Amino acid sequence: MELGSMPMLARERDWAIAARQDIALLDQIARTIDGPFHLVNPASFADNLAAFQRVLRERSVAGRVYFGKKANKAAAWLREVAKLDGAVDVASVPEFVHTLANGVRGEDVGVTGAAKSDDLLWLASRHGATVAIDALDELERAIAIADQARPLRVLLRVLPPKSPNSRFGLNPTDLSAALRRCGEAQQQITVEGFSFHLDGYAVLPRAELAATLVELCKETRSQYGFPCSAISIGGGFACAYVEQDDWQNFRERLDPSQFHAEKSFQQFYPYHQSPTGASMLDAILATEVGSEMLASKLIAAQVALYLEPGRALLDGAGLTVFPVQGFKRNAEHGIVTVAGLSMSLSEQWKNSEYLPTPMLVQRGPDRPQERVRAAIGGSSCMEYDVLTWRKILFPAAPRHGDLIVYPNTAGYQMDKNESEFHQLALPPKIVVSQEGGAFTWRMDQP
């Protein structure tokens, strides 16, 4: 089987299938927006968040699920967080303000990122947020700001031992210095515990480092009297965009000839993984470290588990629609040009490719159903403005007025690298809900 005809079909939620098959819905939105747009479904996000929270309850582990806000800027997600008593992870003043404006309380906000601004630290202090301290100089600024505002709740971010070259986290020497300094500044700083973030999506390293931090919490309580009642294991919760067989076949048959201009890629996101989402959290908690499950260690030590999923909370919760502006044949394959830019499909700007297969929604008069392979380009003047280099097998030649639907794009794809290049408007986010089997839609609120 040729790679170009392989399915790589996305695993879709029922709402997404129904929405892309609802021609009247897409037609109404397309005529209103007159350009590319994103559909977001808060109900799917809420289901994902509830699943993570359910794992914590069923394992009898105290904890909080912080939505990694950087994964998508829509306000709709924040309203669901507030409804479900969740929390939000932010890394800038605008993210913090946006979160508060959508009903999430300050004490339910976690502040991460490197070298936070004074304004961000001040907001965190005023609103009772928890701050992950990443460096000694940041700690000094936090102490000074808390002295003028309110005592600051902090987690000390630990440099993972197996990632010594990471630019994030306190090495052992700095961690010891930070603890001593916090001991001197207990009027300004409350050490709630420790945090880390690991690259990749493996279960075992997260469980092992979490267990190490549980022991560190116990030692620090004894030595300094800090509460040390929580650890954060960060994000990196896996998703499965396509079925295992499709992903395996794709990798085995990968060849530059299947891409426009024989484009080659060094790596792809792992589009099929297991376990994923809340099941991965359950696997982490069930992992035996030493002679005891991590969940048991947390319970015995009375340490809460914080986590910061982004992509995993957005899995299945959005899709992106690009109107077709034109189609032409180029040698043995065609080029579809869509309204919009590849910056609205962010994976393309990581020297990679978003692989779940885009789908053609045919509009207008009937046409011959003669299959054609085509790559998909944006409407800019740049040769490399390409949304899909892979030659997709379409059931018919796309034409002006059709729509191209990219599935499952809510996690990082929609707005991570968006740009108003050529003064083109950014694709708006459209919130869709189903009531009595019919869709309603509205613009996402700022």
Spans of features found by a protein language model:
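Active-site-proximal loop/turn and secondary-structure-junction residues that shape catalytic pockets
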Residues: 71-73, 94-95, 115-117, 135-139, ...
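Non-cysteine beta-strand/loop elements that form the S-adenosyl-L-methionine
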Residues: 91-94, 112-116, 151-160, 191-196, ...
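A charged N-terminal "starter" segment
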Residues: 1-133, 139-144, 150-151, 186, ...
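Conserved anion-binding
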Residues: 135-190
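Conserved, mostly hydrophobic/aromatic
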Residues: 45, 70, 92, 124, ...
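C-terminal active-site-proximal or functional interface alpha/beta core segments in diverse enzymes
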Residues: 202-203, 208-446
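Conserved strand-turn element in the central/C-terminal portion of the radical SAM core barrel
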Residues: 128-132, 191-202
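General beta-strand structural signal in soluble alpha/beta enzymes
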Residues: 67, 88-91, 111, 132-135, ...
